[in-house]
Amino acid sequence: MSVEEGPTAEEADPLDAFRQFFALERDVLVLSLAMFAFSLGFQMTSRYMAEYLYALGTGAVIVGVFGSVGNVISALYPYPGGAISDRIGSRYALTVFGLLSTVGFAVWLVAPWLGPLAVPAVFLGLFLSQAWKSFGLGASFAIVKQAVPPSQLAAGFASTETFRRTAFLVGPLIAAALFYPFGSGDADVVLAFQLILLVAVVFGVLGTAAQHLLYDPGGDSFGTEFEGVSQLVADLRNLPAELRPLLVADTLVRFANGMVYVFFVVVVTRFLGTGLDLAAPAVGDLSLSPQSYFGVLLGLEMLVALLTMVPVAKAAERVGLKPVVALGFFVYAIFPILLINAPPGDAAVLAALFAFSGLRFAGLPAHKALIVGPAETGAGGRVTGAYYLVRNLIVIPSAALGGLLWAGFSNPLTGEEVFAGDPTVAFGIATAVGLVGTGYFALFGEEFEAYT
Protein backbone atom coordinates (compact mmCIF):
# COMPACT_ATOMS: atom_id res chain seq x y z
CA MET A 1 0.00 0.00 0.00
CA SER A 2 1.38 3.40 -0.93
CA VAL A 3 1.31 5.71 2.06
CA GLU A 4 2.90 9.12 1.99
CA GLU A 5 1.10 10.51 5.00
CA GLY A 6 -1.10 9.05 7.69
CA PRO A 7 -4.73 8.87 6.58
CA THR A 8 -6.90 11.73 7.67
CA ALA A 9 -10.59 12.22 8.18
CA GLU A 10 -10.80 13.85 4.75
CA GLU A 11 -9.25 10.81 3.11
CA ALA A 12 -11.99 8.65 4.57
CA ASP A 13 -14.86 10.89 3.52
CA PRO A 14 -17.13 8.84 1.24
CA LEU A 15 -18.89 11.98 0.02
CA ASP A 16 -15.87 12.64 -2.23
CA ALA A 17 -16.80 9.41 -3.98
CA PHE A 18 -15.98 9.84 -7.61
CA ARG A 19 -13.17 12.43 -7.20
CA GLN A 20 -9.99 10.35 -6.84
CA PHE A 21 -12.40 7.81 -5.42
CA PHE A 22 -13.47 9.20 -2.11
CA ALA A 23 -9.98 10.72 -1.70
CA LEU A 24 -8.88 7.46 -0.12
CA GLU A 25 -5.56 5.70 -0.64
CA ARG A 26 -4.85 4.39 -4.12
CA ASP A 27 -5.14 0.80 -2.87
CA VAL A 28 -8.75 1.32 -1.80
CA LEU A 29 -9.43 2.74 -5.26
CA VAL A 30 -7.90 -0.30 -6.93
CA LEU A 31 -9.78 -2.65 -4.63
CA SER A 32 -13.00 -0.82 -5.44
CA LEU A 33 -12.42 -1.08 -9.19
CA ALA A 34 -11.88 -4.82 -8.81
CA MET A 35 -14.97 -5.03 -6.64
CA PHE A 36 -16.92 -3.26 -9.37
CA ALA A 37 -15.84 -5.75 -12.02
CA PHE A 38 -16.36 -8.89 -9.97
CA SER A 39 -19.59 -7.65 -8.43
CA LEU A 40 -21.01 -7.23 -11.92
CA GLY A 41 -20.27 -10.87 -12.52
CA PHE A 42 -21.54 -12.06 -9.16
CA GLN A 43 -24.75 -10.07 -9.22
CA MET A 44 -25.62 -10.98 -12.79
CA THR A 45 -25.13 -14.67 -12.05
CA SER A 46 -25.55 -15.63 -8.41
CA ARG A 47 -29.03 -14.18 -7.97
CA TYR A 48 -30.23 -16.19 -10.99
CA MET A 49 -28.63 -19.54 -10.14
CA ALA A 50 -31.84 -21.07 -8.78
CA GLU A 51 -33.65 -20.13 -11.99
CA TYR A 52 -30.78 -21.62 -14.01
CA LEU A 53 -30.98 -24.88 -12.06
CA TYR A 54 -34.76 -25.04 -12.49
CA ALA A 55 -34.29 -24.50 -16.24
CA LEU A 56 -31.78 -27.37 -16.29
CA GLY A 57 -34.46 -29.65 -14.85
CA THR A 58 -33.85 -29.61 -11.09
CA GLY A 59 -36.18 -28.56 -8.27
CA ALA A 60 -36.32 -26.95 -4.85
CA VAL A 61 -34.33 -29.65 -3.04
CA ILE A 62 -31.35 -29.40 -5.42
CA VAL A 63 -31.55 -25.61 -5.27
CA GLY A 64 -31.49 -25.82 -1.48
CA VAL A 65 -28.49 -28.15 -1.56
CA PHE A 66 -26.77 -25.75 -3.98
CA GLY A 67 -27.38 -22.94 -1.51
CA SER A 68 -25.97 -24.98 1.36
CA VAL A 69 -22.88 -25.93 -0.66
CA GLY A 70 -22.44 -22.22 -1.23
CA ASN A 71 -22.66 -21.79 2.53
CA VAL A 72 -19.96 -24.44 2.99
CA ILE A 73 -17.73 -22.47 0.65
CA SER A 74 -18.52 -19.23 2.45
CA ALA A 75 -17.57 -20.90 5.72
CA LEU A 76 -14.35 -22.56 4.58
CA TYR A 77 -12.88 -19.98 2.21
CA PRO A 78 -12.61 -16.73 4.21
CA TYR A 79 -10.29 -17.91 6.99
CA PRO A 80 -7.58 -19.46 4.77
CA GLY A 81 -8.11 -16.57 2.37
CA GLY A 82 -7.48 -14.08 5.17
CA ALA A 83 -4.46 -16.03 6.40
CA ILE A 84 -3.03 -16.21 2.87
CA SER A 85 -3.56 -12.48 2.45
CA ASP A 86 -1.83 -11.72 5.76
CA ARG A 87 1.07 -13.96 4.75
CA ILE A 88 1.75 -13.18 1.07
CA GLY A 89 0.08 -9.80 0.68
CA SER A 90 -3.19 -8.67 -0.79
CA ARG A 91 -2.05 -8.17 -4.38
CA TYR A 92 -1.05 -11.74 -5.17
CA ALA A 93 -3.82 -13.24 -3.08
CA LEU A 94 -6.54 -11.31 -4.88
CA THR A 95 -5.02 -12.04 -8.30
CA VAL A 96 -5.18 -15.80 -7.75
CA PHE A 97 -8.67 -15.56 -6.32
CA GLY A 98 -9.80 -13.46 -9.29
CA LEU A 99 -8.51 -15.99 -11.81
CA LEU A 100 -10.28 -18.84 -10.04
CA SER A 101 -13.56 -16.94 -10.01
CA THR A 102 -13.32 -16.18 -13.72
CA VAL A 103 -12.78 -19.87 -14.49
CA GLY A 104 -15.85 -20.63 -12.38
CA PHE A 105 -18.01 -18.34 -14.50
CA ALA A 106 -16.69 -20.13 -17.60
CA VAL A 107 -17.59 -23.55 -16.16
CA TRP A 108 -21.15 -22.35 -15.57
CA LEU A 109 -21.22 -21.11 -19.15
CA VAL A 110 -20.45 -24.51 -20.69
CA ALA A 111 -22.46 -26.59 -18.19
CA PRO A 112 -25.62 -26.98 -20.36
CA TRP A 113 -23.49 -28.55 -23.12
CA LEU A 114 -22.28 -31.32 -20.81
CA GLY A 115 -25.51 -33.34 -20.85
CA PRO A 116 -25.89 -35.45 -17.69
CA LEU A 117 -22.89 -33.68 -16.18
CA ALA A 118 -24.56 -30.26 -16.41
CA VAL A 119 -25.71 -30.07 -12.80
CA PRO A 120 -22.42 -31.42 -11.35
CA ALA A 121 -20.62 -28.81 -13.47
CA VAL A 122 -22.78 -26.09 -11.94
CA PHE A 123 -21.67 -27.25 -8.50
CA LEU A 124 -18.02 -27.35 -9.62
CA GLY A 125 -18.33 -23.83 -10.96
CA LEU A 126 -19.65 -22.74 -7.58
CA PHE A 127 -16.43 -23.83 -5.84
CA LEU A 128 -14.39 -21.79 -8.32
CA SER A 129 -16.57 -18.73 -8.81
CA GLN A 130 -16.74 -17.95 -5.10
CA ALA A 131 -12.96 -17.70 -4.74
CA TRP A 132 -12.61 -13.92 -5.08
CA LYS A 133 -15.75 -13.16 -3.12
CA SER A 134 -14.99 -15.50 -0.20
CA PHE A 135 -11.23 -16.13 -0.28
CA GLY A 136 -10.63 -12.44 -0.91
CA LEU A 137 -12.84 -11.25 1.94
CA GLY A 138 -10.02 -11.06 4.48
CA ALA A 139 -7.70 -9.39 1.98
CA SER A 140 -10.24 -6.71 1.09
CA PHE A 141 -10.98 -6.00 4.77
CA ALA A 142 -7.26 -5.75 5.51
CA ILE A 143 -6.69 -3.22 2.70
CA VAL A 144 -9.36 -0.88 4.04
CA LYS A 145 -8.14 -1.25 7.63
CA GLN A 146 -4.59 -0.31 6.55
CA ALA A 147 -5.76 2.77 4.64
CA VAL A 148 -8.38 4.24 6.99
CA PRO A 149 -8.15 5.50 10.59
CA PRO A 150 -10.27 3.61 13.16
CA SER A 151 -12.86 6.36 13.63
CA GLN A 152 -13.49 6.45 9.87
CA LEU A 153 -13.78 2.73 9.16
CA ALA A 154 -17.49 2.88 8.32
CA ALA A 155 -16.83 5.64 5.79
CA GLY A 156 -13.94 3.65 4.33
CA PHE A 157 -16.10 0.59 3.90
CA ALA A 158 -18.87 2.78 2.52
CA SER A 159 -16.40 3.87 -0.16
CA THR A 160 -15.67 0.34 -1.37
CA GLU A 161 -19.27 -0.74 -0.83
CA THR A 162 -20.55 2.16 -2.94
CA PHE A 163 -18.51 1.08 -5.97
CA ARG A 164 -19.43 -2.54 -5.32
CA ARG A 165 -23.11 -1.71 -5.03
CA THR A 166 -22.93 0.46 -8.14
CA ALA A 167 -21.97 -2.73 -9.95
CA PHE A 168 -24.86 -4.43 -8.18
CA LEU A 169 -27.10 -1.77 -9.74
CA VAL A 170 -25.64 -2.06 -13.24
CA GLY A 171 -25.28 -5.85 -13.25
CA PRO A 172 -28.96 -6.75 -12.83
CA LEU A 173 -29.94 -4.18 -15.44
CA ILE A 174 -27.54 -5.84 -17.89
CA ALA A 175 -29.12 -9.18 -16.98
CA ALA A 176 -32.61 -7.74 -17.49
CA ALA A 177 -31.59 -6.44 -20.92
CA LEU A 178 -30.14 -9.81 -21.93
CA PHE A 179 -33.27 -11.63 -20.76
CA TYR A 180 -35.55 -9.13 -22.53
CA PRO A 181 -35.53 -10.68 -26.05
CA PHE A 182 -36.20 -14.16 -24.67
CA GLY A 183 -39.28 -15.86 -23.32
CA SER A 184 -39.81 -17.62 -20.00
CA GLY A 185 -39.33 -21.17 -21.27
CA ASP A 186 -36.48 -23.22 -19.88
CA ALA A 187 -34.53 -23.24 -23.16
CA ASP A 188 -34.78 -19.46 -23.41
CA VAL A 189 -33.69 -19.05 -19.79
CA VAL A 190 -30.61 -21.23 -20.36
CA LEU A 191 -29.55 -19.36 -23.52
CA ALA A 192 -30.06 -15.92 -21.98
CA PHE A 193 -28.14 -16.91 -18.87
CA GLN A 194 -25.23 -18.19 -20.95
CA LEU A 195 -24.98 -14.73 -22.52
CA ILE A 196 -24.93 -13.24 -19.03
CA LEU A 197 -22.16 -15.64 -18.02
CA LEU A 198 -20.11 -14.62 -21.05
CA VAL A 199 -20.29 -11.01 -19.88
CA ALA A 200 -19.27 -12.15 -16.38
CA VAL A 201 -16.17 -13.87 -17.78
CA VAL A 202 -15.13 -10.66 -19.55
CA PHE A 203 -15.51 -8.57 -16.39
CA GLY A 204 -13.66 -11.20 -14.36
CA VAL A 205 -10.65 -10.93 -16.67
CA LEU A 206 -10.73 -7.13 -16.49
CA GLY A 207 -11.05 -7.09 -12.70
CA THR A 208 -8.18 -9.52 -12.20
CA ALA A 209 -5.92 -7.53 -14.51
CA ALA A 210 -6.79 -4.23 -12.83
CA GLN A 211 -6.04 -5.35 -9.30
CA HIS A 212 -2.78 -7.09 -10.30
CA LEU A 213 -1.37 -4.25 -12.40
CA LEU A 214 -2.54 -1.24 -10.40
CA TYR A 215 -2.33 -2.33 -6.76
CA ASP A 216 0.85 -1.19 -4.95
CA PRO A 217 1.91 -3.91 -2.49
CA GLY A 218 4.71 -1.83 -0.97
CA GLY A 219 2.85 -1.01 2.23
CA ASP A 220 1.07 -4.29 2.87
CA SER A 221 1.22 -5.27 6.52
CA PHE A 222 2.15 -8.92 6.89
CA GLY A 223 1.07 -11.12 9.75
CA THR A 224 3.03 -14.05 11.06
CA GLU A 225 3.27 -17.34 9.21
CA PHE A 226 0.07 -19.37 9.38
CA GLU A 227 0.50 -22.10 11.96
CA GLY A 228 -2.41 -24.31 10.97
CA VAL A 229 -5.34 -25.45 13.07
CA SER A 230 -3.73 -24.31 16.33
CA GLN A 231 -3.66 -20.75 15.05
CA LEU A 232 -7.27 -21.00 13.92
CA VAL A 233 -8.34 -22.19 17.37
CA ALA A 234 -6.36 -19.38 18.99
CA ASP A 235 -7.94 -16.80 16.69
CA LEU A 236 -11.41 -18.07 17.55
CA ARG A 237 -10.68 -17.97 21.28
CA ASN A 238 -9.20 -14.49 21.01
CA LEU A 239 -11.99 -12.87 19.04
CA PRO A 240 -12.50 -9.41 20.58
CA ALA A 241 -15.27 -9.40 23.17
CA GLU A 242 -17.18 -6.76 21.20
CA LEU A 243 -17.68 -9.26 18.39
CA ARG A 244 -19.38 -12.01 20.37
CA PRO A 245 -22.92 -10.55 20.68
CA LEU A 246 -22.66 -9.35 17.09
CA LEU A 247 -21.62 -12.83 15.99
CA VAL A 248 -24.60 -14.50 17.70
CA ALA A 249 -27.11 -12.05 16.25
CA ASP A 250 -25.50 -11.99 12.82
CA THR A 251 -25.54 -15.79 12.69
CA LEU A 252 -29.26 -15.94 13.46
CA VAL A 253 -30.10 -13.27 10.90
CA ARG A 254 -27.92 -14.88 8.24
CA PHE A 255 -29.36 -18.33 8.95
CA ALA A 256 -32.82 -16.89 8.39
CA ASN A 257 -31.75 -15.17 5.20
CA GLY A 258 -29.93 -18.29 4.03
CA MET A 259 -33.11 -20.35 4.25
CA VAL A 260 -34.78 -18.29 1.53
CA TYR A 261 -32.25 -16.07 -0.25
CA VAL A 262 -31.51 -18.48 -3.09
CA PHE A 263 -35.25 -18.81 -3.73
CA PHE A 264 -36.01 -15.09 -4.20
CA VAL A 265 -35.73 -15.36 -7.98
CA VAL A 266 -37.96 -18.44 -8.04
CA VAL A 267 -40.60 -16.62 -6.00
CA VAL A 268 -40.72 -13.83 -8.58
CA THR A 269 -40.43 -15.96 -11.72
CA ARG A 270 -42.36 -19.13 -10.83
CA PHE A 271 -44.27 -18.80 -7.54
CA LEU A 272 -45.69 -15.32 -8.23
CA GLY A 273 -44.93 -15.28 -11.96
CA THR A 274 -44.77 -11.51 -11.99
CA GLY A 275 -43.43 -9.62 -14.97
CA LEU A 276 -43.98 -6.03 -16.05
CA ASP A 277 -46.34 -4.72 -18.73
CA LEU A 278 -45.96 -1.01 -19.22
CA ALA A 279 -47.38 1.37 -21.81
CA ALA A 280 -44.63 3.86 -22.60
CA PRO A 281 -45.66 6.59 -25.09
CA ALA A 282 -42.11 7.10 -26.35
CA VAL A 283 -41.29 3.46 -27.09
CA GLY A 284 -44.69 1.76 -27.16
CA ASP A 285 -45.77 -1.13 -24.98
CA LEU A 286 -43.02 -2.65 -22.86
CA SER A 287 -43.41 -6.22 -21.68
CA LEU A 288 -40.79 -7.79 -19.41
CA SER A 289 -40.77 -11.48 -18.59
CA PRO A 290 -40.56 -12.37 -14.89
CA GLN A 291 -36.87 -13.21 -15.41
CA SER A 292 -36.18 -9.82 -16.96
CA TYR A 293 -38.28 -7.98 -14.37
CA PHE A 294 -36.35 -9.67 -11.56
CA GLY A 295 -33.22 -7.94 -12.86
CA VAL A 296 -35.04 -4.61 -12.75
CA LEU A 297 -36.11 -5.33 -9.17
CA LEU A 298 -32.52 -6.07 -8.16
CA GLY A 299 -31.44 -2.84 -9.79
CA LEU A 300 -34.08 -0.93 -7.84
CA GLU A 301 -32.93 -2.62 -4.63
CA MET A 302 -29.36 -1.51 -5.27
CA LEU A 303 -30.42 2.01 -6.21
CA VAL A 304 -31.98 2.42 -2.77
CA ALA A 305 -28.85 0.91 -1.21
CA LEU A 306 -26.63 3.39 -3.01
CA LEU A 307 -28.78 6.37 -2.08
CA THR A 308 -28.79 5.43 1.60
CA MET A 309 -25.41 3.78 2.24
CA VAL A 310 -23.19 6.86 2.42
CA PRO A 311 -25.62 9.03 4.46
CA VAL A 312 -26.15 6.16 6.89
CA ALA A 313 -22.39 5.60 7.23
CA LYS A 314 -21.98 9.29 8.05
CA ALA A 315 -24.88 9.10 10.49
CA ALA A 316 -23.10 6.21 12.23
CA GLU A 317 -20.34 8.64 13.18
CA ARG A 318 -22.95 10.58 15.18
CA VAL A 319 -25.27 7.89 16.53
CA GLY A 320 -22.86 4.95 16.63
CA LEU A 321 -22.61 1.72 14.67
CA LYS A 322 -25.08 -0.34 16.69
CA PRO A 323 -28.37 1.37 15.65
CA VAL A 324 -27.34 1.25 12.00
CA VAL A 325 -26.48 -2.45 12.15
CA ALA A 326 -29.74 -3.19 13.96
CA LEU A 327 -31.72 -1.48 11.20
CA GLY A 328 -30.06 -3.66 8.58
CA PHE A 329 -30.80 -6.80 10.60
CA PHE A 330 -34.48 -5.86 10.89
CA VAL A 331 -34.89 -5.40 7.15
CA TYR A 332 -33.14 -8.71 6.51
CA ALA A 333 -35.56 -10.41 8.91
CA ILE A 334 -38.89 -8.97 7.79
CA PHE A 335 -38.41 -9.07 4.00
CA PRO A 336 -39.04 -12.83 3.41
CA ILE A 337 -42.55 -12.86 4.89
CA LEU A 338 -43.46 -9.72 2.97
CA LEU A 339 -42.19 -11.13 -0.33
CA ILE A 340 -43.87 -14.53 -0.18
CA ASN A 341 -47.22 -12.91 0.64
CA ALA A 342 -47.07 -10.37 -2.20
CA PRO A 343 -50.07 -10.51 -4.56
CA PRO A 344 -49.25 -12.47 -7.75
CA GLY A 345 -48.90 -10.34 -10.84
CA ASP A 346 -48.63 -7.04 -9.00
CA ALA A 347 -45.42 -5.50 -10.30
CA ALA A 348 -45.83 -2.31 -8.27
CA VAL A 349 -45.96 -4.16 -4.94
CA LEU A 350 -42.81 -6.10 -5.81
CA ALA A 351 -41.07 -2.87 -6.74
CA ALA A 352 -41.96 -1.37 -3.36
CA LEU A 353 -40.76 -4.49 -1.52
CA PHE A 354 -37.40 -4.63 -3.27
CA ALA A 355 -36.92 -0.91 -2.69
CA PHE A 356 -37.52 -1.57 1.01
CA SER A 357 -35.08 -4.49 0.86
CA GLY A 358 -32.39 -2.09 -0.32
CA LEU A 359 -32.35 -0.57 3.16
CA ARG A 360 -30.71 -3.73 4.52
CA PHE A 361 -27.53 -2.81 2.68
CA ALA A 362 -27.38 0.59 4.36
CA GLY A 363 -26.01 -1.04 7.50
CA LEU A 364 -23.29 -3.08 5.80
CA PRO A 365 -20.44 -0.54 6.08
CA ALA A 366 -21.19 -0.10 9.78
CA HIS A 367 -21.46 -3.86 10.17
CA LYS A 368 -18.03 -4.40 8.59
CA ALA A 369 -16.54 -1.62 10.70
CA LEU A 370 -17.93 -3.30 13.81
CA ILE A 371 -16.24 -6.56 12.77
CA VAL A 372 -12.79 -5.35 11.74
CA GLY A 373 -12.48 -2.34 14.05
CA PRO A 374 -11.34 -4.21 17.17
CA ALA A 375 -8.73 -6.26 15.26
CA GLU A 376 -5.02 -5.61 15.75
CA THR A 377 -3.03 -4.26 12.79
CA GLY A 378 -1.58 -7.12 10.75
CA ALA A 379 -4.30 -9.55 11.86
CA GLY A 380 -7.35 -7.94 10.27
CA GLY A 381 -7.59 -10.65 7.64
CA ARG A 382 -7.50 -13.48 10.20
CA VAL A 383 -9.99 -11.83 12.57
CA THR A 384 -12.39 -11.25 9.70
CA GLY A 385 -11.88 -14.77 8.42
CA ALA A 386 -12.38 -16.33 11.87
CA TYR A 387 -15.58 -14.34 12.42
CA TYR A 388 -17.05 -15.41 9.10
CA LEU A 389 -15.89 -18.99 9.61
CA VAL A 390 -17.94 -19.36 12.78
CA ARG A 391 -20.98 -17.60 11.34
CA ASN A 392 -20.97 -19.41 8.05
CA LEU A 393 -20.35 -22.87 9.52
CA ILE A 394 -23.56 -22.55 11.50
CA VAL A 395 -25.44 -21.15 8.50
CA ILE A 396 -24.43 -24.08 6.23
CA PRO A 397 -27.67 -26.12 6.46
CA SER A 398 -30.00 -23.13 6.17
CA ALA A 399 -30.60 -23.29 2.40
CA ALA A 400 -31.10 -27.06 2.44
CA LEU A 401 -33.61 -26.63 5.26
CA GLY A 402 -35.39 -23.97 3.24
CA GLY A 403 -35.49 -26.30 0.23
CA LEU A 404 -37.01 -29.11 2.30
CA LEU A 405 -39.64 -26.79 3.75
CA TRP A 406 -40.40 -25.51 0.23
CA ALA A 407 -40.63 -28.94 -1.48
CA GLY A 408 -41.66 -31.15 1.42
CA PHE A 409 -40.09 -34.39 2.59
CA SER A 410 -40.97 -37.97 3.47
CA ASN A 411 -39.86 -40.51 6.05
CA PRO A 412 -36.84 -42.21 4.41
CA LEU A 413 -37.71 -45.55 6.03
CA THR A 414 -41.41 -45.79 5.23
CA GLY A 415 -41.80 -43.36 2.36
CA GLU A 416 -44.70 -41.74 4.17
CA GLU A 417 -45.00 -38.02 3.58
CA VAL A 418 -44.00 -36.05 6.66
CA PHE A 419 -44.48 -32.53 5.32
CA ALA A 420 -46.09 -31.62 2.01
CA GLY A 421 -44.00 -28.53 1.49
CA ASP A 422 -45.11 -24.93 1.64
CA PRO A 423 -43.05 -21.94 0.48
CA THR A 424 -45.04 -19.65 2.76
CA VAL A 425 -44.10 -21.73 5.80
CA ALA A 426 -40.42 -21.69 4.79
CA PHE A 427 -40.38 -17.92 4.43
CA GLY A 428 -42.40 -17.39 7.62
CA ILE A 429 -39.99 -19.46 9.70
CA ALA A 430 -37.10 -17.53 8.19
CA THR A 431 -38.60 -14.23 9.28
CA ALA A 432 -39.19 -15.54 12.82
CA VAL A 433 -35.56 -16.63 13.18
CA GLY A 434 -34.34 -13.32 11.79
CA LEU A 435 -36.41 -11.32 14.25
CA VAL A 436 -34.94 -13.31 17.15
CA GLY A 437 -31.45 -12.37 15.97
CA THR A 438 -32.41 -8.72 15.59
CA GLY A 439 -33.84 -8.62 19.10
CA TYR A 440 -30.75 -10.28 20.56
CA PHE A 441 -28.49 -7.68 19.00
CA ALA A 442 -30.69 -4.84 20.22
CA LEU A 443 -30.39 -6.17 23.77
CA PHE A 444 -26.79 -7.34 23.95
CA GLY A 445 -24.88 -5.80 21.03
CA GLU A 446 -21.88 -3.59 21.90
CA GLU A 447 -20.61 -0.39 20.32
CA PHE A 448 -17.09 -0.02 18.84
CA GLU A 449 -15.25 2.41 21.13
CA ALA A 450 -14.02 4.60 18.25
CA TYR A 451 -17.67 5.52 17.62
CA THR A 452 -18.62 6.24 21.22
Predicted regions and their residues:
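Hydrophobic core of transmembrane alpha-helices in multi-pass small-molecule transporters
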Residues: 118-136, 347-362
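C-terminal membrane-cytosol helix-exit motif in multi-pass small-molecule transporters
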Residues: 201-220, 437-444
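C-terminal transmembrane helical hairpin of 12-TM major facilitator-type secondary transporters
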Residues: 322-364
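Flexible cytoplasmic inter-helical loops of multi-pass small-molecule transporters
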Residues: 2-13, 212-235, 448-452
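Helix-loop boundary and gating motifs at the non-cytosolic
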Residues: 13-73, 242-297
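C-terminal ends and interior cores of transmembrane alpha-helices
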Residues: 99-116, 330-344
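Helix-to-loop junctions at the C-terminal end of transmembrane segments
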Residues: 77-89, 179, 308-320, 406
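A membrane-interface helix-boundary motif in multi-pass transporters
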Residues: 179-201, 406-434
